[in-house]
């Protein structure tokens, strides 16, 4: 981040573009800033893993997909497997259609990524240094108004549920 005119601005472009992602054709190099791959995860089915050192505070990947309305979100949310990310009060991004690979990043109560929404783009940023071979994780923070979803992250700080109490 840097300061401009007294305001803090967020750098949204990648420092470099990830290339040579032959191990995981499901990762879209247009939206990934570092080399990563998809493989089996101890958290849930498949996960996304760093293939190179990722410094703290950097854009790692953009969550992309089809932009859908709340009504369509409710319809698609009835499925057993969904990749829905709420953008704002009206729009949701469905990573199942046109996803960058970020939709496969698993939940953890003590994640190494955090989310930033900048000008309608959902960015996953590194919360700390990430080492090669480490699984990329983010806190999904599902609403407590939704059905409880059991967490399987095994982190020391695990809440037991992916849901968090809304304030």
What kind of region is each of these model predictions?
Residues 10, 17-115:
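Catalytic cores of histone-lysine modification enzymes
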